[in-house]
Curated annotation (Swiss-Prot):
Sequence similarity: Belongs to the class-I aminoacyl-tRNA synthetase family.
Taxonomic source organism: Burkholderia ambifaria (strain MC40-6)
Extent of motif 'HIGH' region: 42-52
Keywords: Aminoacyl-tRNA synthetase, ATP-binding, Cytoplasm, Ligase, Nucleotide-binding, Protein biosynthesis
EC number from the UniProt entry: 6.1.1.4
GO molecular function annotation: aminoacyl-tRNA deacylase activity; ATP binding; leucine-tRNA ligase activity
Keyword Protein biosynthesis: yes
PROSITE patterns: AA_TRNA_LIGASE_I
Tree of life domain: Bacteria
Name of the protein in its database record: Leucine--tRNA ligase
Length: 864
């Protein structure tokens, strides 16, 4: 073996052995417990970033540790390859999205392989491949048969110049990102999946998952089960009687209604705008706004009075109807009751437009004022009804019951459970996605593609230009025959939401070569024992994958109803930021590698200059690594300079997996230095370490016993930390082990070999290359087999036994020293040793002991 640690050589040798042995190809094995750990599959953006490195290393560490503990472990990988970024890149570079995507996959796969990850590449999938998305189409058709998939109109952002639908993020200040045209809202037919049919189950099943509590809460809030009252305000228009329906969770405040607001798309708004240009102009303005709930939450709340009133269902008083830009047709009934006295948004709206504000609940000790909103105005826990006629004095629950009963008696409404969750719209007016398997026939209407004709293959040679969906212009794709009547027909040009692709890929990993969607192997591996990904996926991806899994179960495809037993949301990787700001306020961000930072005497950064010109830059603080802040670190540069093991060691040591990790160049150098020490000890002592000599543990000398005691004590903690996924303290344990072994004076070669072998196995899951090569070079592989499957070291409990124990020695309650006594020594022996100790003589001022307190195994306190 080399005297010097050369990461490139070590890693090439180890990876060569793993490839030759097909070391990570995994098969089902009923004789072993299984452990299926999956990292959320990446989007092939071009290069890995440090967040990827951290995520995959966590997964890899878990895999290797459990494999050593006898588990049949599986770590697969794939590519979430469809989506809008590929279309944007294609437009920018003039190449088909397919070429851009496949080139990126090739590069990123090479990066992953250079990290030494234990991936079973025989299971690799790319969601843009027909043999994968065929099953998206197949299940969609099954859902269509069962009524889970259906078609209805939905609201989209429409660019009238480019004649195309825009995603929410492509609408900038109400204009199309490419054309600059004012964006309109349009109603178009789209396909939806009835995720709401599973709302109760999705909510209730969260309780049985080993997921972070904050993720569960985020999903609970998104599903949003609400108990309230659905009722209508009666009105008459053009001789027709009808109800303006609303849903509220605060029926106790119904006597405080002073207006109603409807969405711009509400049928009543459309009717009331006829012949009123100012109303129609406002409706058109609303339709140019964003269609996402998040957009509505942050936009300025605007409204226009219609001049029309409905009647209050309990008092008969007129209630003015407004059109509000903050009311979404896709949520609830597309109309809301306005109670400005007790809803903060309504309060602001009423103050803005001079609408009446009525107090109808009161809280003891609180004074109501119209001057400014106070938090207690919306309280339902302690408040009672006032100014509400027969409901005065009732608390929230009783008031809701009474109001609901009266509304029901009048035929206006009743109690209702509603959900914030909405059905999943899966139609996307984009090219680079799974084609929706529907054919439009002028005679037969919408006809599902027959199962035997799947997949509907997406052409991969089209280059989008931003002016509409390329599929609509591709005659070869578009034109077909109707499966029912044989007449000329057109294919559906919408593609599926890319969340469909990521909703079941983990099941396909288990049976990648199956000629069905999944097979019996899926029930062996699934559900995932551990899923790893960022908190940003807490809602949509994780919720959709849970729904998709339950649909697969109900269709008899699988036996499980949840995709993942346990979830780890790894923390973000942070780095310093630096920038300069020009006169217009525009910031230019500089990469930390191009900046020199000066520090004060306490190590705090106090200034920074750009290396190219020596001029100052502003310290922007520590933020998440991102392209926008230009503060990323290229993992490939790190691997090329220090080796993959150093990158892995640093990312595991710098912080616990679930916490944020602050990048540190000094930390990387420290990780590299530690690995050089591990290697150097092995190389320097290779003759002693390679000698396979047995020993009698009982006959060992003090130095050997002390070293074994230290190593097995630390091993016990490291094993516990591996089990609780605290890999940073595992690395700390390994550092303690090396210090103990390297500093052991008088230890015999046999004990050095034993303890160094423990160190290599403890470190192996984190830094597999260097430990694998040392294990082989020092002859451990000949004795125990390759490190890949070497058994996890067991703690020798006998080695932890001590002939002597150390007690804290106190004089008058103050620590004055340490006292070594024989393990099992009698109380008299301990007291005698204590008063004979030189610390007692020094701190007792010559006074005799009045009292001696012995706390067994812990301390002796001499009172003088």
């Amino acid at each position: 073996m080399h005297e010097r640690y050369v990461p490139a050589d070590v890693e090439a040798a180890a990876q060569g052995d793993w490839r030759a042995a097909d070391a990570y190809k995994t098969r089902e094995d009923s004789q072993k417990p299984k452990f299926y750990c999956v990292s959320m599959l990446p989007y092939p953006s071009g290069k890995l970033h440090m967040g990827h490195v951290r995520n995959y290393t966590i997964n890899d560490v878990m895999y290797r540790y459990l494999r050593m503990n006898g588990y049949n472990t599986l770590m697969p990988m794939g590519w979430d390859a469809f989506g809008m970024p590929a279309e944007n890149a294609a437009m920018a570079n003039g190449v088909p999205p397919a070429k851009w995507t496949y080139d990126n996959i090739d590069y990123m796969k090479g990066q992953m392989q250079s990290m030494g990850l234990a991936i079973d590449w025989s299971r690799e999938i790319a969601t843009c491949k027909p043999d994968y998305y065929k099953w998206n189409q197949w299940l969609f058709l099954k859902m269509l048969e069962k009524g889970i998939a259906y078609k209805k109109t939905g609201t989209v952002n429409w660019d009238p110049v480019d004649q195309t639908v825009l995603a929410n993020e492509q609408v900038i200040d109400g204009r199309g990102w490419r054309s600059g045209a004012l964006v309109e809202k349009r109603e178009i037919p789209m396909y939806y999946l009835r995720i709401t049919q599973y709302a109760d189950e999705l909510l209730n099943d969260l309780d049985g998952l080993g997921w972070p509590e904050r993720v569960k809460i985020m999903q609970q809030n998104w599903i949003g089960k609400s108990f309230g009252v659905n009722f209508g305000f009666p009105y008459e228009l053009d001789g027709e009687k009808a109800l303006l329906r609303v849903f509220t969770t605060r029926a106790d405040t119904i006597m405080g209604v002073t207006f109603c607001a409807v969405a711009a798309e509400h049928p009543l708004a459309t009717r009331l705008a006829q012949g009123k240009p100012e109303l129609q102009a406002f409706i058109d303005e609303c339709k140019r706004g964003g269609v996402a709930e998040a957009d509505v939450a942050t936009m300025e709340k605007k409204g226009v009075a219609t001049g029309f009133s409905v009647s209050h269902p309990l008092t008969g008083e007129p209630v003015e109807v407004w059109i509000g830009n903050y009311v979404l047709m896709s949520y609830g009934e597309g109309a809301v009751m306005g109670v400005p006295g007790h809803d903060e948004r309504d309060f602001a709206f009423a103050k803005k437009y001079g609408l009446p504000i009525k107090q109808v609940i009161a809280s003891e000790g609180q004074t109501y004022s119209l001057d400014a909103w106070q938090e207690w105005y919306g309280d339902k826990e302690t408040a009672v009804c006032v100014n509400s006629g027969k409901y005065d004095g009732l608390r929230y629950a009783d008031a809701v019951d009474a109001v609901a009963a009266d509304l029901k008696a009048g035929g206006y409404g009743d109690k209702q459970v509603t959900w914030r969750l909405r059905d999943w719209g899966v139609s996307r007016q984009r090219y680079w996605g799974t084609p929706i398997p529907i054919i439009h026939c002028p005679s037969c209407g919408d006809v599902p593609v027959p199962e035997q004709d799947l997949p509907v293959v997406l052409p991969e040679d089209l280059v989008p230009d931003g002016s509409g969906n390329p599929l609509a212009k591709s005659e070869a794709f578009l034109n077909c025959s109707c499966p029912k009547c044989g007449a000329a027909a057109k294919r559906e040009t919408d593609t599926m939401d890319t969340f469909v692709d990521s909703s079941w890929y983990f099941s396909r990993y288990t049976a990648p070569d199956a000629d069905t969607m999944v097979d019996a192997r899926t029930d062996y591996w699934m559900p995932m024992d551990q899923y790893i990904g960022g908190i940003e996926h807490a809602i949509l991806h994780l919720l959709y994958s849970r729904f998709w899994t339950k649909v697969m179960r109900d269709l008899g495809l699988v036996k499980f109803g949840e995709p993942a037993k346990n979830l780890l949301t790894q923390g973000m990787v942070l780095n310093e930021t630096f920038y300069r700001e020009d006169a217009s306020g525009k910031k230019t961000w500089y990469n930390p590698a191009d900046v020199t930072v000066t520090h004060d005497d306490k190590g705090r950064p106090v200034g920074a200059t750009l290396n190219t010109d020596g001029q100052p830059v502003v310290l922007g603080g520590i933020e998440k690594m991102s392209k926008s802040k230009n503060n990323g670190v290229d993992p490939q540069v790190l691997i090329d300079q220090y080796g993959a093991d150093t990158a892995r060691l640093f990312t595991m040591f710098a912080a616990p997996p679930e916490q944020q990790l602050e990048w540190s160049g000094a930390g990387v150098e420290g990780a590299s230095r530690f690995l050089r020490r591990v290697w150097s000890f092995g190389a320097t002592n290779r003759e002693a370490l390679a000698a396979r000599a047995g020993f009698d543990a009982a006959a060992l000398g003090d130095a050997d016993k002390a070293l074994r005691r230290e190593i097995y004590s630390v091993l016990k903690q490291a094993d516990f930390d591996y089990q609780r996924l605290q890999y940073n303290t595992v690395v700390s344990a390994a550092m303690k082990m090396l210090n103990a072994i390297d500093g052991a004076k008088g230890a015999t070669p046999a004990v050095l070999r034993e303890t160094y072998g423990v160190l290599l196995r403890v470190l192996y899951p984190v830094v597999p290359h260097v430990t694998f090569e040392l294990w082989k070079a020092l002859g451990y592989a000949d004795e125990f087999g390759p490190l890949l499957d070497a058994p996890w070291p067991k703690v020798d409990e006998a080695a932890l036994e001590q002939a002597e124990i150390e007690l804290v020695l106190q004089v008058n309650g103050k620590v004055r020293g340490a006292l070594k006594v024989a393990k099992g020594a009698s109380r008299d022996a301990i007291e005698a040793a204590a008063v004979a100790d030189e610390a007692f003589a020094k701190f007792s001022d010559g006074k005799p002991a009045k009292k001696i307190v012995v706390v067994p195994g812990r301390l002796v306190n001499i009172v003088v």
